[in-house]
């Protein structure tokens, strides 16, 4: 089975898959921010949370120890986190699409040319830039009341208070940086140049097809 990728292209496809899966998995896991509330550990992502308070019997607050997403988009604690959810999600989707095409290029001949590989690298740069923008927007939501309750009521924008950043935040940012810097550069050498013989055969095949259609139309 011939590949449409060079040896560098095969490495590019592998790294593209790794960065896409790393960033996307980190996006969905609620381990971007760690804190505590009512003596229980609490963690957040942009649209998910683990352990949250609810009103129990007698209107007392109790902690529900489970993970889940917010009930609606508007329930996300801050506008900055809402924007982060959309921007980061779009970037992850773009990286996954490019990674899928790159993996298919390892198995299919003539799928990815030199120019196509560079265009896919540009798409990876945009995807990584979107995820990086989401990571940059994330600290803008640390001044919301829900986050302040978890971070000792002393957190603010770009100030964690008693909270700390989680490993998923770093993985998302690291995956985005690798996609922008490494994968984009490798994509310039990923695709094979089309062979002249293949180009001639393709042109002749199309020409013959058009000639047959024209001849069929001209016949009475």
UniProtKB/Swiss-Prot annotation:
Coiled coil ranges: none
GO cellular component, one term: membrane
Pfam families per the UniProt record, alphabetical: L_HMGIC_fpl
Segment forming the signal sequence: 1-20
Domain of life: Eukaryota
Residues that carry a glycan: 153
Tissue-level expression: Widely expressed. Expressed at high levels in lung, thymus, skeletal muscle, colon and ovary.
Keywords tagged on the record: Glycoprotein, Membrane, Signal, Transmembrane, Transmembrane helix
Transmembrane segments: 86-106, 122-142, 165-185
Membrane topology, as annotated: Multi-pass membrane protein
Name the UniProt record assigns to this protein: LHFPL tetraspan subfamily member 1 protein
Species of provenance: Homo sapiens (Human)
């Amino acid at each position: 089975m011939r590949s449409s990728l060079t040896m560098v292209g095969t490495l590019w496809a592998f790294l593209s898959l790794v960065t896409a899966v790393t960033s996307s998995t980190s996006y969905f896991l609620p381990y971007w921010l760690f804190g505590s509330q009512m003596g229980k550990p609490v963690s957040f992502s942009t649209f998910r949370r683990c352990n949250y308070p609810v009103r129990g019997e007698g209107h007392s607050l109790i902690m529900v120890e489970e993970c889940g997403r917010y009930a609606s988009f508007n329930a996300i604690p801050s506008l900055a986190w809402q924007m982060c959810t959309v921007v980061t999600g779009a970037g992850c989707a773009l990286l996954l699409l490019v990674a899928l095409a790159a993996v298919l290029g390892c198995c299919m001949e003539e799928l990815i040319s030199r120019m196509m590989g560079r265009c896919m690298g540009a798409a990876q740069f945009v995807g990584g830039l979107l995820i990086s923008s989401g990571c940059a927007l994330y600290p803008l939501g640390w001044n919301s009341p829900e986050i302040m309750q978890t971070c000792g009521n002393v957190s603010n924008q770009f100030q964690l208070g008693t909270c700390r950043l989680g490993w998923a935040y770093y993985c998302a940012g690291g995956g985005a940086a690798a996609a922008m810097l490494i994968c984009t550069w490798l994509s310039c050498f990923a695709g094979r140049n089309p062979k002249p013989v293949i180009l001639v055969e393709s042109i002749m095949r199309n020409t013959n097809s058009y000639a047959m259609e024209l001849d069929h139309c001209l016949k009475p």
